[in-house]
Amino acid sequence: YSQIKGQPRTEEGNFWHKQIYPNQVWLDGIYMAQPFYALYEKHFGDGDFSDTVGQIQTVRAKMFSKDKGLYFHGYDASRSAFWADPETGCSRNFWLRSLGWFAVALADLTEILPDGAGRDKLVPIFTELMASVGRYADPDTGLYWQVPDQGGRADNYLETSGSAMMAYAMLKGARLGLLEKGYAAKGQKTFHGIVEKYLSVTETGLNLGGICLVAGLGPENNRRRDGSYEYYISEPVVENDAKGVAPFVLAYTEVKRLRS
């Protein structure tokens, strides 16, 4: 909590992603900070969630593409990063796992925040994203593409971690009554699609494949991470990385709740 309170902020009031990424907001970082921040305020603070709500609203205002219904991976408030659009400050593409982190953060925050504490401002942002992202799912498997809006490209691939996050968010949203019941079926389809495509049993036990190892934007001395389509599909695809296994387990907990 002391780290959060001392974290540098952009001119709009959002936390920097990291010290080495000054003035930058990444979708990944919303999940890293905001659910914990809100839980701390709920149990140990004064119950003021306005900071969390305000930061989410800024992400919606600055990083949302109305044309695609998706959020760009990063935003540089200073417009000085080599990957940032000089007018909008946003990176140029959408990355599935960053969208997944944001979706999971929203799903969790809508459960954490009580009524009358800004929850009503987050719910429309969550439902809007779930409605728009669903149209990018692969119709056969229910999975989502590494670069979600470019699924027709031969070198793009169906990615596990972000797909599991979307499954979790849709299942949880339906359970909480924020989404129509049909979203539970969509979430189940995605989860079972992951099982069929990427979960295997070997001599060492269960193995989960199709996981993008890592992706980011910069810093200045790493210009390969430029937010291009070619960059996102160039990162290693691995098995059993925690960033894929953990969301898969989270999605499974929601599948189990649905069955109970």
Language model feature labels by segment:
Residues I30-Q34, V53, T58-M63, D67-S91, ...:
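His/Met- and acidic-residue-enriched segments that coordinate or traffic transition-metal cofactors
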Residues Q3, G13, Y157-L158, G162, ...:
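CBM-like carbohydrate-recognition segments
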Residues Y1-M32, H43:
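Extracytoplasmic mature domains of secreted/periplasmic and thylakoid-lumen proteins
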Residues M32, D51, W101, I125-E128, ...:
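Charged catalytic carboxylate motif
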Residues H17-I30, W83-V104, D115-L122, D138, ...:
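Solvent-exposed loop and edge beta-strand segments that line ligand/cofactor-binding
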Residues Y1-N14, S50-W83, V123-T141, K186-E203:
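Long, well-ordered core segments of solenoidal/helical folds
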Residues Q34-D46, W101-G118, A164-L179, P247-R259:
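Well-ordered alpha-helical scaffold segments within catalytic/enzyme domains
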Residues E11, S65-G69, I112-R119, D138-Y144, ...:
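Surface-exposed helix-capping loop/turn segments at secondary-structure junctions
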